[in-house]
Curated annotation (Swiss-Prot):
NCBIfam families named among the record's database cross-references: PRK00843.1 (NF002022)
Keyword Ubl conjugation: no
EC primary class: oxidoreductase
Molecular-function GO terms, alphabetical: glycerol-1-phosphate dehydrogenase (NAD+) activity; glycerol-1-phosphate dehydrogenase (NADP+) activity; metal ion binding
Pathway(s) where this gene product acts: Membrane lipid metabolism; glycerophospholipid metabolism
This protein's name: Glycerol-1-phosphate dehydrogenase [NAD(P)+]
Binding site residues for NAD(+): 93-97, 115-118, 124
Amino acid sequence: MHIMEFPREVILGKNVISETVNVAKRLSFSSPVLVVYGPKTKEIAGKDVERVLKEEFDVHSVIVKEATINEVEKVEGIIRDNKVKWAIAVGGGTIIDVTKLASYRAGIPFVSFPTTASHDGIASANASIKGLGTKTSIKARPPVAVIADIRIIKSAPRRYLAAGVGDVISNITAVRDWKLAHKIKGEYFSEYAAALSLMSAKMVMRDAEIIRIGDDEGVRKVVKALISSGVAMSIAGSSRPASGAEHLFSHALDLLLEKPALHGEQTGIGTIIMAYLHGINWRKIKETLQKVGAPTTAYELGVDPEIIIEALTIAHTIRPERYTILGRDGLTREAAERAAKITGVI
């Protein structure tokens, strides 16, 4: 049996914080609610969301600092102890992922209120949490609603929007890997999920100039593409439409680096290299990332070239059951170095 779950409402516009109450009413939510935010996102939007919700609901709040299993358990404990009926995550990937898994484990719905458009977790069922063995994604449930305030997302540093493009563009190689796994391993493949995923990537490539400007229209396009990516994963019932070898490379960097770059920045560079391995137009991908201001080299990413090579050689071990262009044995050091050099990453 294949159950597809999607957000029931997506609100995308300017100054939509006040909509949180209306969304909650339409979804028949009751008190109490838990507002989850980070130290920074509390000031950016968290306090305002809290204030609006207090007009109609009993509100609890909690600060989350990192995407670890300890933080998930802390939030889950607050939900259970206070008999919280629903949660709202106000923040970036860390806050959304922790709230997603904690609410799933506690059996309550959650609303996603992204303050950046840096990765496709804003509407997907998957959460990346450290402390579960390796930092790969774990399946939970997607948000029942997404409330994206363009004014808030636009005010975030520009690199976040560029990282969002990096995460969406990785759908190109992810779908290639998925097709490969279908052909070689007989893995389930959904044409519909793949088409939606690729459409999201093609949209950001087509609109790179608009996104580069970073105005309302550019933000809107990236947010829509990220949400479509999340929906594609829900249709597939896995992260396959948006996560292939380029994500394994990013997870490898997470393990090797004390302070990794943004997820979408890493997957963007991974996509350039994996596109080269697939024999598809990696130059066009690189060009798009350059246009929007995303890093395309190890230097721009702030990572030693040696680490890039090592990440490429261990990427296949991150999730052995996920078949990709890297195959079962992965890349040799020579092949990894050659791919990174030819694409200009190192």
